[in-house]
Amino acid sequence: MMKLLIIVVLLVISFPAY
């Protein structure tokens, strides 16, 4: 459950970078 949250956070942070 924790890993999923971390993955989602990383995706949200990385997506606007593009």
From Swiss-Prot:
Species name: Escherichia coli (strain K12)
Domain of life: Bacteria
Stated family: Belongs to the Ibs toxic protein family.
One Pfam assignment: Ibs_toxin
Lineage: Bacteria, Pseudomonadati, Pseudomonadota, Gammaproteobacteria, Enterobacterales
Gene inactivation effect: None seen. An isbB overproducing strain cannot be made in the absence of the sibB gene.
Keyword annotations: Toxin-antitoxin system
Biological function: Toxic component of a type I toxin-antitoxin (TA) system.
Protein name: Small toxic protein IbsB
Disulfide bridge map: none
Note: Part of the SIBb repeat region (formerly known as QUAD1b), encoded on the opposite strand from the sibB (formerly knowny as ryeD) RNA.
Induction notes from the record: The sibB sRNA probably represses expression of ibsB mRNA, either by destabilizing the transcript and/or preventing its translation. Expression of the proteinaceous toxin is controlled by antisense sRNA SibB.
